[in-house]
Amino acid sequence: MNTRQLLSVGIDIGTTTTQVIFSRLELVNRAAVSQVPRYEFIKRDISWQSPVFFTPVDKQGGLKEVELKALILAQYQAAGIAPESVDSGAIIITGESAKTRNARPAVMALSQSLGDFVVASAGPHLESVIAGHGAGAQSLSEQRMCRVLNIDIGGGTSNYALFDAGKVSGTACLNVGGRLLETDAQGRVVYAHQPGQMIIDEVFGSGTDARALAAAQLGQVARRMADLIVEVITGALSPLAQSLMQTGLLPADITPEVITLSGGVGECYRNQPADPFCFSDIGPLLATALHEHPRLREMNVQFPAQTVRATVIGAGAHTLSLSGSTIWLEDVQLPLRNLPVAIPQDDADLVNAWRQALLQLDLDPQTDAYVLALPATLPVRYAALLTVINALTAFVARYPNPHPLLVVAEQDFGKALGMLLRPQLPQLPLAVIDEVVVRAGDYIDIGTPLFGGSVVPVTVKSLAFPS
């Protein structure tokens, strides 16, 4: 059996907390000798987990780069792992941390110092999907062929991911979390973030001083927060819930058969702390309010496989060498790294399907760099090629982008597609790479051409989640 073993690392930098997870991954090529390689994870063993520590931020809300790097390197040392011995990895930055002024450069610098890692600055849609995968909601939905809604409730946001038979059918993000009100050990509010103050104003009246609230009154705030979280599930949103939405709503009239709660508040929902202010916020109070919420008690709430550690545990990577006779490559400057792949869910309307796939990745079709994947079910016929050409030209016309048009296909028709597409888009840098199998959430690197341009190395990187 053709297998590969990797030592990988997953680093999750969130609004409130950061964690590091080392894992040993084993990938197997499931394809026959004559077929396109198709790698799958067969073992995902977590070998070491760091404590969950607070994300270091300064008074202006920026990441403290030096302190963050020192914290992460300390986890390598504690695990007894040298950075150079790690084969692959993923750094995910989420929540309010992703919005800080120095988030992207800080994480890219960290990645370059540690190795060639997948780097994802996750907005609300991608964060929801990552949490749903990490919690095990996606695999539960796939195994049971049912609809599972995971709600990842962290410090600043609640991220919703709806899976239908394993596929993402909706995401949403509500600006409600357990650390919107920071407290001291006695439950006195020391700081109210703006969304938290908005909730206080609705419950107690505009202009209420959060620092004057008693512990019992914080319970009222937590109950209103629980109401808001449930409103997003039911689709009946109050004006306050509407104002706190960071995204669109979940699909209407679709009832999840199972609900799972992950994140720090999800962990408190599972294991309620004796001290409600042990984390110096109202996360435990919010978990209690969710436990007692009458509408939520009517729903099928189950504990997920992971709660506070619902995140990536690393990234699997495998490299393919592709024959230049089957690809089209013109005016594209290589190498290109960490390109997210947009995989369409609807073969009938590729333009809209690509747009939806990019939305799930929190990517802007007109500014970000990405790869458009063709449907794996597409037949190798001339009529199918014409359909793809029409879709690609329509997509480029609707979403002009300064980056090259990059297309990846499982089928063996890259050269033909490129030759037919080039007259339609004569000025656009273009790459069509075929015989590559990709899945939702994958990233690819396209290396510098080898052997006089006859071979292009392509590395497919898949995020790894707890099994």
UniProtKB/Swiss-Prot annotation:
Consequence of gene loss (knockout): Can use ethanolamine (EA) as a nitrogen source when AdoCbl but not cyano-B12 or hydroxy-B12 is provided; cannot use EA as a carbon source. Required for aerobic growth on ethanolamine supplemented with cobalamin (vitamin B12). A non-polar deletion mutant does not grow on EA between pH 5.5 and pH 8.5.
A Pfam family reported for this protein in Swiss-Prot or TrEMBL: EutA
InterPro entries per the UniProt record, alphabetical: ATPase_NBD, EutA, FtsA/MreB
Keywords from the named record: Bacterial microcompartment, Chaperone, Virulence
GO cellular component: bacterial microcompartment
Localization (cell): Bacterial microcompartment
Protein's pathway: Amine and polyamine degradation; ethanolamine degradation
Upregulation: Part of the 17-gene eut operon transcribed from a single promoter, induced by ethanolamine and adenosylcobalamin (AdoCbl, vitamin B12).
One BP term from GO: ethanolamine catabolic process
Taxonomic superkingdom: Bacteria
Known role: Reactivates suicidally inhibited ethanolamine ammonia-lyase (EAL), cyanocobalamin-inactivated EAL and O(2)-inactivated EAL; requires Mg(2+), ATP and adenosylcobalamin. Reactivation probably occurs by the ATP-dependent exchange of cobalamin. Protects EAL from inhibition by CN-B12, does not have adenosylation activity. Expression of the eut operon allows this bacteria to use ethanolamine as a carbon, nitrogen and energy source. It relies on cobalamin (vitamin B12) both as a cofactor for the ethanolamine ammonia-lyase (EAL) activity and to induce the operon. EA enhances bacterial survival in macrophages in a concentration-dependent manner, suggesting it is an important nutrient during infection.
PANTHER family (alphabetical): CELL DIVISION PROTEIN FTSA-RELATED, ETHANOLAMINE AMMONIA-LYASE REACTIVASE EUTA
Family: Belongs to the EutA family.
Protein name from the UniProt record: Ethanolamine ammonia-lyase reactivase EutA
Source organism (scientific name): Salmonella typhimurium (strain LT2 / SGSC1412 / ATCC 700720)
UniProt lineage: Bacteria, Pseudomonadati, Pseudomonadota, Gammaproteobacteria, Enterobacterales
Gene that this sequence comes from: eutA
